Amino acid sequence: LNKEDLLKMIPDADRIKDSLEKNLKKNKLSATSKNGMVTAVINYQQEITDLVIDNRLLDPTKAGALKASLVEALNQAIKSSRNKMLEETARAIKLI
């Protein structure tokens, strides 16, 4: 069986899938670097929707700190988003 066959076997699978995707795109969370200078906002589909950078990090001499803060905030946001995506998927599956 492939994915399409499985979806045909589940009543309202398309409706459930569409609802899940809508919720994953709509719901957002944020993560901030330890130094508090970068905040990443991400939806549950793991798409970055906003990035807030403290102006002090835009100084060219702070490029290393900016990079480290971006990586930290983005990785934390992705990790949190992944967990929320799994929770939402589990919730949708229980509706079947």
Name each region found by the language model.
Residues 1-30, 79-96:
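Long amphipathic alpha-helical segments used for membrane anchoring, targeting, substrate engagement
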Residues 11-15, 19, 31, 44-45, ...:
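Residue-level signal for functionally critical sites in structured catalytic/ligand-binding pockets
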Residues 16, 38-41, 52, 71, ...:
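Extended aliphatic helical segments
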Residues 29-52:
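Short edge beta-strands and adjacent turn/loop segments
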Residues 56-87:
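Active-site- and interface-proximal helix/loop "cap" or "latch" segments in soluble metabolic
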